[in-house]
Amino acid sequence: MTKRIVAITTSLLMTILLIPASAFASSPVEPDPGVDVQIDAAGASFPFPLIDLWRVEYGKLYPNVQLNYQSIGSGGGVKNHISETIVFAASDAPLKPTESEAAPNTLHIPEAIGGVTIAYNLPGMSESELKLTGEVIADIFLGKITKFNDPAIQNLNPGVSLPDEDIVVAHRSDGAGTTFVFVSYLAQVSQEWDEKVGVGKSVEWPAGIGGKGNEGVANVIKTTPYSIGYIELAYAFQNDIPYAAVENADGTNFVLPSMQSIAAASAGAAPTLPQAHESWYGISIINAPGDNSYPISTFTYLLVYENLNNVTNDPDTAQSLVHMIHWMITDGQKFSESLHYVPIAPEVQKIGIDGLKRVQFNGESAWVESDTTSYVQPVITEQPTVVEESVPQPYEQPIVVQQTNNQSLSSEMELLSFYITALIALIAIAVILVIILIIVNMSLVASIKKKI
């Protein structure tokens, strides 16, 4: 009987102890609803559809905070970040050592994971028919393969009737993180590319025509028959452009970019990632191993100064920025899959949250702790949800929706739920203590009886 009580007691205690600490995570205080704030930002076009959707959804919750994000490319975003003309930047490429020296104490906050597609316009060919290896892709962009029916392409696609047409190569004309990701992949799979062209946000292209932003390259491909180029997955869906299956790093499979294959490429990356305030240069999930890993996958980042006095003299802007980015990398992740981005894992969210807690304004923490404790719901699984192949165009104007009494009631109910949960936990602990006291008392009585 005593052993059984001890076992039950131990079980109850372990149940309480195993409640994850992340279940009740701290959060920064909400923006002051009585103060209007505009946050200016710029950078990568790669995550622009997602950032633009965040702008709208965050604006519904906090209509007094407006995000003005300019999709000018990672290169332009980094330049503006270094010159301190924007509040934060977005980039698909981590800062190089020289850029980190020019912008010291910059935090890298992962915001999403995406894939760069090899998109093409082949009249008469349906989506997903074309298969390409990294070496063939490199030779196309080197200008060595100039026809779609070149034996190097035809041998990878037996049974597919490829046209005897000149290939029109489309690439970025601006400094771009998408370019950095793409050419980093080419440098890994082609020694000739690595030696002749190399890696960067902007390179000397051996062949092709340029387009500004992912939007521009997508437009070139869509309007130019027999063209091929590289664009982020969301833009391929958005513009209904077919894209190729690319040979994986192991050489065992041709993999289409998808939620599952991009997630597979990022699987296992979290434990190896640095902290937000550390260098991210060289961090990559490009050409990650795995039978179903899409080889041209990447994190995309928000760049934020630890000292916000570098970019603003307004305390409300500083406080609102911290809250908004915290929302983007936690609650905002639920919007990622609808635009074909992979949400960041809870462990990666924590890197960003820990980084935000380092942010200072006027010598004090810009992270002001909220009075309530929020539940952080994990948002990524090993098999992400497959969504319909349609993506809304980026929003032109913010949709401002005033907070309703229902929203206020929801917040009060969440707070009440938290207190009820805490009360239940305290009651459980009290019950355990009573059981322990009973056991001790029974043991003492038994001991006294034996002595008598």
Go through each PLM region and give its residues.
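N-terminal cationic leader/targeting segments used for protein routing and processing
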Residues: R4, N406-Q407, K450
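Bacterial N-terminal signal peptides
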Residues: T9-P20
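Cytoplasmic C-terminal tails of single-pass
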Residues: S443-I452
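Flexible loop/hinge segments at secondary-structure junctions
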Residues: A25-Q402, N406-E412, Y419, I429-A430
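Short, Lys/Arg-rich N-terminal segment immediately upstream of the first membrane anchor
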Residues: M1-T2, M413, K451
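Selective detector of the "anchor" transmembrane alpha-helix that sits immediately C-terminal
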Residues: F418-M442
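Bacterial N-terminal signal peptides that target proteins for export
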Residues: M1-T10
